[in-house]
């Protein structure tokens, strides 16, 4: 059974070597004096189909790339010049690890994790201050925003009542007499009949107290004047008779005067 497992292991190892280099990964842990140079074990190099060039690019997930010189021996591959700057940029500490993947273009894509296996944010988050293209895009966006604010016009504010009235207002369609005639002929309505007496009373019924016209007042004054003119001779005659006649004559004249007064009153009333 042990022989069978050994055969399987060798077969899997051979199949892995036949994979494309872009599908292969290896992990290095920062140990010893790694700040100035980094040694890559030969077992890692032997798994690659191609040779590692004398100068490579180490690129993190935030597209931050560093050029590193590679020295080769029979036993190992050493990252030398440029490596110290890479360590400083990403603050590599003892116990940190790096996952390498060779993409075949003299470039290794790397993922950096700390001592407890967490990916370092500085190797994944894009730093816009070091990317001129991102800075230009930010400046353009700021200028566009300021320009839009400068040209924007304030909208007039309306009161709540005006807004409600405006939103609920509906134009009323105008109908001509011709448009209304078919409707009236289609739905004739019976007109209520009124008696002549009710119509006359309704039309001529006074709405306030009756007042005598000025013409009637003037006419009544005109008719009353003859009554005064007739009574004046009678009064004068009565005074003369009272002075010259006896008591019986005065009675007779008084009766005559009264009868004349009654006649005048009757004429005025009629």
Swiss-Prot record:
<feature type="compositionally biased region" description="Low complexity">
    <location>
        <begin position="244"/>
        <end position="259"/>
    </location>
</feature>
<feature type="DNA-binding region" description="TF-B3">
    <location>
        <begin position="23"/>
        <end position="116"/>
    </location>
</feature>
<feature type="compositionally biased region" description="Polar residues">
    <location>
        <begin position="143"/>
        <end position="159"/>
    </location>
</feature>
<protein>
    <recommendedName>
        <fullName>B3 domain-containing protein Os08g0324300</fullName>
    </recommendedName>
</protein>
<feature type="compositionally biased region" description="Polar residues">
    <location>
        <begin position="228"/>
        <end position="243"/>
    </location>
</feature>
<keyword id="KW-0238">DNA-binding</keyword>
<dbReference type="Pfam" id="PF02362">
    <property type="entry name" value="B3"/>
</dbReference>
<dbReference type="InterPro" id="IPR050655">
    <property type="entry name" value="Plant_B3_domain"/>
</dbReference>
<feature type="region of interest" description="Disordered">
    <location>
        <begin position="127"/>
        <end position="159"/>
    </location>
</feature>
<dbReference type="InterPro" id="IPR003340">
    <property type="entry name" value="B3_DNA-bd"/>
</dbReference>
<keyword id="KW-0539">Nucleus</keyword>
<dbReference type="InterPro" id="IPR015300">
    <property type="entry name" value="DNA-bd_pseudobarrel_sf"/>
</dbReference>
<dbReference type="GO" id="GO:0003677">
    <property type="term" value="F:DNA binding"/>
</dbReference>
<keyword id="KW-0805">Transcription regulation</keyword>
<feature type="region of interest" description="Disordered">
    <location>
        <begin position="227"/>
        <end position="259"/>
    </location>
</feature>
<keyword id="KW-0804">Transcription</keyword>
<dbReference type="GO" id="GO:0005634">
    <property type="term" value="C:nucleus"/>
</dbReference>
